[in-house]
Amino acid sequence: MTIHYEELNGKNFNTYSLDHFVRHQRVIECWRNVDGQWKLIPIEFEENWTVEQCQKIAADVALHMGNDQTAIGAFDGEEVIGFITVSHNIFGNTAKYVELVCFQVSEPYRGKKIGKTLFYKACEEAKRLGADKLYISAHSSKESQAAYKAIGCVHACLLYTSPSPR
């Protein structure tokens, strides 16, 4: 397995590029703010993207890449096995933020530092765009939050409750 990373464009990414992507997550607990304290609450569900959902996400990535977002892909051969997108819109009063819009690694490739590499590439892109920080609105599951914490993320000083800054 030789993984390579490159910016997504019309030559290496299209609506069908995620047809074999495995977006699966079994959630048992999620973080919730209860009376001002973060607590793990039992919330069980399973997420599985269908091919149609993968195509919808891919079409959205393709629409924005190179325009108002930068998209970076992780490839195993020619197959997209992970991707991350960063908005070009800088916002914020206390710091210059850009939003990490989408961040996914196909299930068979998790735990291999592919997500960490993609995340660091997104940080480099944010700096290139002139931002100080990435704004991340992440899944509240125990596992997702642990993954972000493991790569050095902390709770934001700036919180948007709605709508997304995009």
Segments (PLM) and residue ranges:
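Conserved GNAT acetyl-CoA-binding A-motif
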Residues: K127-S137
